[in-house]
Amino acid sequence: MLFLCLSTVFFIPSLSAEEPSEPIPLHILAVNDFHGQISPGQKINGTPVGSIPVLGAYLSNATETYGVNNTIIALPGDLTGASPAESNLLLDEPAILFFNRFVTGDWKKTDSTQSGGRVIATLGNHEFDRNVSELLRLINGGNGDTNITHLVDPYPGALWPVIAANVYWNGTENLVFAPYVIEHVNGIPVAFIGAVTQVTSEISEPEKVASVVFTDEADAINAQVQALQKEGIHAFVVLLHEGGTQTPYDGPTRETGDLSGRVASIVIRLDEDVDVVLSGHTHAFTNQFLPNAGGKPTLVTQAYSYSSAYADVSLALDTQSRDVVNSSATIITTYADQGPGQIPDTNAQELLDAVNTTVAPFTSQVIATTDIPLTRTPDENGEALLYNIVTDAFRWYMKTDMSILNIGSLRADIDAGEITTGEAYSVMPFHDQINIVQMTGQQILDLLNQQWTRTVKPDHLLQISGFTYSYDESREPQDRVIHITFEGKDLDMNKKYTVATTDFLISGGDGYTVMKEGDVIAYGALDVDEFIEYLKSIPSPIHQKTGGRIIRVGNQSEDAMTAG
């Protein structure tokens, strides 16, 4: 008996001394705010980026490098909506078909292959641009209400899970979508939970989202985490369509950073088991660890927008605890002339060619003509011709007193000659919603002065319609506007005026925080739709000129100003 006991004592340390298994790698390729940007045209520092042939090459190369069984493509919202013409006219189906290609191997196929990859998506606010029923069709499949030839007939829908833990049918406790999906990586379960920004109902047209309710993101995520913890799951990745801003840098995640914005206030409330938050919505760079509710570091990423980049997230999964024991990320820009971008994805190129052939008869429709180029270049006063026409369009369509738009909203000039629907979409690829905000004369004055006090692009002036103003750059930045005229009279500082502008500006975009002081009183259509309708309504050819709306003192007499 003594020998047996000694033998037992001898063998126990031997078992405990075995080398632990190596952690299992999981690589997540996160593409946020794609917005149907299937075509080339985007540039960073003058270098072409994005498009599905280029993005497809990057994602395919990364998947091949890491291994299909250890790679997941994640889409943290706004995959569709606010899309260019070629996507928009096809009801955003090309974006879905492109990512189906990573599951099926071919965008035309409608069933997954045994060796197919994995894709997971959550929703963004722009997924609700048309309405909830159309969103469900886009996800679940079935031909949409369009007379354009279908690329795949019948349209198959998304061949991958779409998750959202905080979207409920109005008046019920029923979720519209599955809140999470469990993916197994070498036998280790990893939970992916989705959530869309709670303010979706505030930044969408009310009738489009009347049937659903968006609840608090952190509460919804935590509820799912706690339920799944009871099932023994401890590795959690969140797809969150909400974001912030951070100073960009190259390379892997750094220990410190300056991330700010609404995403930070959400992460700090998340359960300590949440390992990664793949964010979106703000079209910005994010790559930082933030403390969660338990004080543990949560990796937070975001990779710009419009197919120009993706977040390459590397996780290490412990085989014993089945938890994430290491995490890091790098934001990869999808340069077309570098790395994988030099050999475009042939299957994605085939899809893009099919799209362009299909929509050509529609994008080539002539809506107006112009005798002169309509450019975005400001004159000596800071006034730009194309912006004058666009702000006139918004004021006309929304029937407001004024219209205000930030430089940078328009992304292409229009050459002399015929103006097509395709060109209109090129001018306005962001597809901002135009709303009416009510502001006092004092708030309008403060907003105009903020052009020189904000830290974002202080040399870019706002573009206007419906009023005139003069400014003097020799005065203090906060007091440069010296005169505002509306309908031939001085602007009344106490009176309220209606202003047509973008949802981007209303939210304080480009540093115009004064805009947030106004009251949104009505919601309109997308900018490009209003622009097209306006061009159809005015005489052609267009021969409008700049002058008289914005006057820099020293260039012209202020008396020369006329209402625009």
What are these regions (language model features)?
Residues 7-21:
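N-terminal signal peptide
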